[in-house]
Curated annotation (Swiss-Prot):
GTP hydrolase that promotes the GTP-dependent binding of aminoacyl-tRNA to the A-site of ribosomes during protein biosynthesis. Belongs to the TRAFAC class translation factor GTPase superfamily. Classic translation factor GTPase family. EF-Tu/EF-1A subfamily. GO terms for cellular component: cytosol. Its EC number is 3.6.5.3. Pfam families: GTP_EFTU, GTP_EFTU_D2, GTP_EFTU_D3. This is Elongation factor Tu 2. GO terms for molecular function: GTP binding; GTPase activity; guanosine tetraphosphate binding; translation elongation factor activity. Keywords: Cytoplasm, Elongation factor, GTP-binding, Hydrolase, Magnesium, Metal-binding, Nucleotide-binding, Protein biosynthesis. The keyword Amino-acid biosynthesis does not apply. Residues 19-26 are annotated as: G1. Residues 60-64 are annotated as: G2. It is found in: Cytoplasm.
Length: 396
């Protein structure tokens, strides 16, 4: 049989399972692929296949992640599942697996547990926009009142971290029963209900090309008779010849105009998200632009020096620090294409941060960087990665 071409006719959405250890995230992932494959085609994955997650690297950090995909009536989903808690923390902070929505798995028998809370907090900090709840192991609970109680607890916990607890869809089921072929309400029916909710509750994300133009500066050249060319990969949006552009970060913002876009030595009318381009700037001197700045649509992004962040500190085994760090620690923060020194403020009551920890901190940079909430960065010491982080909230 000839191999069928991957036809992307359906919109593509990225999701993942989160929740406490042993609440059934991987079993649910296996159940979703198994049941949706029967209905919409694709490839089913067993628990064992998903559980043996391969290693991948993101921002110098090794993470174990399983990727599966499945189809529903309306969409194509890419779904990530991690074997261990530390992998979730690293995955969410590095943005290795960007999620348009998360499926929070909570055991109906246990209710919310410490990692349930931590994953909800992480989802809030790193900007996962939507959470759907799958209350698993419902076959182990006979008491309807107990199910209601667990549901209330979950809703309260979501609201506490600024998710719409009262309106969050909660599906009650048993992933194991569904995998075993149970056609009842908590078996296959619950999985199909979950698929419907994924389709209806998570809106289609904005495509990168539809956003405001931004391009991190990688290199700057001066071409005699033509002016200054800035090269880089367009992160978001479209830039056209004649567009006004701001150069943001590291020094006061300046305005300029794009007078040419070239790619592979050919002149284009425009460059768009994903393209590696050279952008010719009118009247801008070579020394006015440097690596680490961004070219952006005027007013769409501002330079900042102070922000709160969620960070993960590499353990010694991962090639990170061997010793803890304390308040006032001054590493380099690597944003997009450059390092900027900054100091870390720890939360009240926290004396030190150990290798392998994740924590919320405030950061003060010595030079401004173009940023908005959700921007990822690496933490480095002399060019060596010792941590990863994400901007939770810009302060000033």
């Amino acid at each position: 049989m000839a191999k069928s071409k991957f036809e992307r006719v359906k919109p593509h959405i990225n999701v993942g399972t989160i929740g406490h250890v042993d609440h059934g995230k991987t079993t649910l992932t296996a159940a979703i692929t198994t049941i949706l494959t029967r209905k919409f085609g694709g490839e089913a994955k067993s628990y064992a296949q998903i559980d043996s997650a391969p290693e991948e690297r993101a921002r110098g950090i090794t993470i174990n992640t399983s990727h599966v995909e499945y189809e529903t009536d309306k969409r194509h989903y890419a779904h990530v599942d991690c074997p261990g808690h530390a992998d979730y923390v690293k995955n969410m902070i590095t943005g290795a697996a960007q999620m348009d929505g998360a499926i929070l798995v909570v055991s109906a028998a246990d209710g919310p547990m410490p990692q349930t809370r931590e994953h909800i907090l992480l989802a809030r900090q790193v900007g996962v926009p939507y959470i759907i709840v799958f209350m698993n192991k419902a076959d182990m609970v006979d008491d309807a009142e107990l199910l209601e109680l667990v549901e209330m607890e979950i809703r309260e916990l979501l609201s506490k971290y600024d998710f719409p607890g009262d309106d969050t869809p909660i599906i009650i089921g048993s992933a194991l029963k569904a995998l075993e072929g149970d056609k009842g309400d908590i078996g296959e029916a619950a999985i199909l209900k979950l698929a419907e909710v994924l389709d209806s509750y998570i809106p289609e994300p904005q495509r990168a090309i539809d956003g405001a133009f931004i391009m991190p500066v990688e290199d700057v050249f001066s071409i005699s008779g033509r002016g200054t060319v800035v090269t880089g990969r367009v992160e978001r949006g479209i830039v056209k010849v004649g567009d006004e552009i701001e150069i943001v970060g590291l020094r006061p913002t300046i305005k300029t105009t794009c007078t040419g876009v070239e790619m592979f030595r050919k002149l284009l009318d425009q460059g768009q998200a994903g393209d590696n381009v050279g952008i010719l700037l009118r009247g801008t001197k070579r020394e006015e632009v440097e690596r680490g700045q961004v070219l952006a649509k005027p007013g769409s992004i501002l330079p900042h020096t102070k922000f709160s962040a969620e960070i993960y500190v590499l353990s010694k085994e991962e090639g990170g620090r061997h010793t803890p760090f304390f308040a006032g620690y001054r590493p380099q923060f690597y944003f997009r294409t450059t390092d900027v020194t900054g100091s870390i403020e720890l939360p009240a009551g926290v004396e030190m941060v150990m290798p392998g920890d994740n924590i919320s901190v405030n950061v003060n940079l010595i030079a401004p960087i173009a940023m908005s909430d959700g921007l990822r960065f690496a933490i480095r010491e002399g060019g060596r990665t010792v941590g990863a982080g994400v901007v939770a909230k810009v302060i000033e």
